[in-house]
Amino acid sequence: MDRVWADWYEPVPSPPFSPVDPPGPRPTTPVPGSSPPSPASTPTPPKRGRYVVEHPEYGPPPDPEEVRVHGARGPGAFCAAPWRPDTRRLGADVNRLFRGIAVSAADVTGDTRALRRALFDFYAMGYTRQRPSAPCWQALLQLSPEQSAPLRSALRELNERDVYDPRVLSPPVIEGPLFGEECDVDEDDAGSDTTVASEFSFRGSVCEDDGEDEDEEEDGEEEDEDEEGEEEEDEEEEEGDEDGETDVYEEDDEAEDEEDEEDGDDFDGASVGDDDVFEPPEDGSDGEGSGSDDGGDGEDEDEDEDEDEDEDDGEDEEDEEGEDGGEDGEDGEEDEDEDGEGEEGGKDAARRGTRAPTRPAAAP
């Protein structure tokens, strides 16, 4: 029976000797017709872990069909035997994870810190020979037993190799942009980081100034200002249209008020300018209660007009009756008109609460 060899960290006891071959040296007496006895030889141990059926780290040997199927697609298609260290591929994979965090994470700094910590933990476990079991691998990587078939196959292949020569790896050359580069920021009073996704530059590091982004922001601000200016102009035009319509209505109202004042219907006591001319009504009345605002000026003009009319009438009478009779009649009529107009002016002044105007002396 062959001796079963286990890994260097898992010793397996040797099987008991067969009762047919008791311990101790064999007899030295040769048997006739047989070859001389040869010394007992120890079998050469196989490679580590080859004959271990249920390995505590990667379990039983996986089914080759499961390794082929899940190693080609799905969550388990991330490792394939044989494994070789590739720092360039490792750097590209980590940068890809940083990109996903930068474009979608709410707490970018916290998530990138968790990724870096996970990478370090796996290295530290391997460095200190803390080897997770098969269920532990499945729980850490969130894989089902079938999906972990390629992983168990790669781990078994690594365990069957000889001891590796230690060496120090050089830094890889990673194609940019580097999404994991962050600027250090101060923490707030609560102790939480204030780093947000906008602090990452998708054209490079955020610590570098990007003139193109600033130009785009300035262009956007200018466009917003132009749009706001156009909106304000439109609002001013609309307000101007409304004001214009209102002015038209106000002008119409003012025109109606002026017409009413001229007719003498609405007297508001406002002053009338010297340029306003009083037009006597067509019925021949003396215009008492007219819409003139200032009684003194309007009455003086009315008296002057009456005097002109009386003088014209007097001239006609002079032509008909003679100079003597005409002059007497004219003087009498003028005196009567003056007395009547004085009384009417006094009544208007008393009604308006003003003093009756003083009429200048009539010319001889």
From Swiss-Prot:
Pfam families: Herpes_IE68. InterPro entries: IE68. Residues 355-364 have a biased composition (Low complexity). Keywords: Early protein. It comes from the Viruses. Residues 181-191, 207-286, 294-343 have a biased composition (Acidic residues). The keyword Nucleus does not apply. The keyword Transport does not apply. Residues 1-73, 173-364 are annotated as: Disordered. One of its GO terms (biological process) is regulation of gene expression. Residues 12-46 have a biased composition (Pro residues). Belongs to the herpesviridae ICP22 family. This is Transcriptional regulator ICP22 homolog. The lineage of its organism: Viruses, Duplodnaviria, Heunggongvirae, Peploviricota, Herviviricetes. The gene is RSP40.
